[in-house]
Regions:
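Flexible, glycine/small-residue-enriched loop-and-beta-strand segment within the central core
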Residues: 1-79, 113-114
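Terminal amphipathic alpha-helical/low-complexity segments used for targeting or macromolecular assembly
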Residues: 28, 42-45, 105-141
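Contiguous hydrophobic segments
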Residues: 5, 18, 38, 92-102, ...
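Active-site/pore-lining binding-face segments in mid-to-C-terminal subdomains
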Residues: 67-118
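Short amphipathic alpha-helical patches
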Residues: 34, 52-55, 89, 126, ...
Length: 141
């Protein structure tokens, strides 16, 4: 199941879901080119001692006003908090805290307590109040 809230902008994305998994994308989220959401894992993994199948399929949750940079990869179990930003080509299957900037493979938080705006970069803008888009203020946790 895929839930996409209002005012979500998706440049291009691939969403792979099977069975009972859910991908949820919160309102006012921006998803850049070639982003992949993958709940499904194609092959089975087993515990070597018990020979029992390991649980693999979990939901993916993206909060409100999240910015996913180009070619991000969200795997089963990923949870991205409100107002967070994932840098280009970042990958995660874990939790990224709200209002944080995460980059890398695997993604790690490099900055907390951020707000982002859809306005293009302009060196004259010194605060969020200089921007037309101030939606990030609504999602501070």
């Amino acid at each position: 199941t895929i839930f996409i809230a209002d005012n979500v902008k998706i440049i291009s994305a691939e969403i792979i879901v099977s069975g009972a998994q859910t991908v949820t994308i919160g309102e006012e989220t921006l998803i850049a080119r070639n982003t992949i959401f993958r709940c499904e894992i194609s092959h089975l993994l087993f515990d070597a001692k018990t020979k029992q199948v390991l649980p693999q399929k979990k939901d993916i949750f993206v909060g409100k006003h999240v910015w996913l940079g180009e070619e991000c990869y969200l795997l089963s179990g990923a949870k991205i908090g409100n107002g967070a930003v994932m840098g280009a080509r970042s990958l995660t299957s874990s939790t990224i805290k709200a209002n944080s900037l995460a980059v890398g493979t695997p993604a790690s938080v490099i900055r907390e307590n951020i707000i982002w705006s859809r306005n293009n970069f302009d060196s004259k803008k010194k605060t969020i109040y200089d921007c037309i888009d101030q939606d990030g203020l609504k999602y501070l946790d």
